[in-house]
Amino acid sequence: MIQQYRDSNQVIWFDEELIEDPSQPIFDAEYWQSTNKVTGSASGRGTTWFVQLDTMQAALRHYRRGGLFGKLVKDNYLFSGWEQTRCAQEFQLLLTLINAGVHVPRPIAARAVKSGLTYQADLLSERIPNARDLVSILQEKPLPEGMYQKIGQEIAKMHNAGVNHTDLNIHNILIDDKDKVWIIDFDKCRKQEHGDWKKQNLERLLRSFKKELLKRQIHWKERDFAVLTEALSCLDIK
């Protein structure tokens, strides 16, 4: 069950099945390092730390801004309410998707810390075991048609749940060792009903395939994307 822990300037949302004491410094990488539970890291906009919980591995991410504005204001966001914080919205969106049967990481805990008119945020979520992103896989070998059908079906499930993934690209689609497809990274994504956002999601995904084809010579051809979209259209609710 999801619970909340509050004190004077912060709110923590957490899954009580996975986190017993949210007052522990679970959002500080130094805490996990001191207990020898850091299993790895990945660099992007910031460092994502992979840590070992009792029953699963988790990914710890501090929210950071990108682009030119991010160079000026790295990790502060305007506060407009606890439920409107980036971490709370991503946490809730993951729960919504899981309830809809979409393969996404399980949210473990999220924290927003308010300071004046701004806040900082962190998210602790499940690290999908034995999974690789499409870029990594396609650099080695092409995917069979059936796997593109699975990818299309998973995107359709997400769309049918009314979730607009505003950064859908092949770095954010994973395949695990059981050939299960996962979708990750839902920061700034949202529930949405009307508009052309489903089409825009697919256009963005297609651009990412073409970009990596030029950049890394991945094993991919446009026919693969047609298979993906055909499978998606069979499940997508208009």
Swiss-Prot record:
CC per GO annotation: plasma membrane
Keyword Kinase assigned: yes
Keyword Protein biosynthesis in annotation: no
Predominant place of localization: membrane
Pathway(s) of this molecule: Bacterial outer membrane biogenesis; LPS core biosynthesis
Root EC class: transferase
Keywords attached to this entry: ATP-binding, Cell inner membrane, Cell membrane, Kinase, Lipopolysaccharide biosynthesis, Membrane, Nucleotide-binding, Transferase
Active-site annotation: 167
Membrane topology category: Peripheral membrane protein
Subcellular location: Cell inner membrane
GO BP: lipopolysaccharide core region biosynthetic process
Matches recorded under SUPFAM superfamilies: Protein kinase-like (PK-like) (SSF56112)
EC number(s) stated in the UniProt entry for this protein: 2.7.1.166
Pfam families to which the protein is assigned, alphabetical: Kdo (PF06293)
Function: Catalyzes the ATP-dependent phosphorylation of the 3-deoxy-D-manno-octulosonic acid (Kdo) residue in Kdo-lipid IV(A) at the 4-OH position.
Family: Belongs to the protein kinase superfamily. KdkA/RfaP family.
Protein name (record): 3-deoxy-D-manno-octulosonic acid kinase
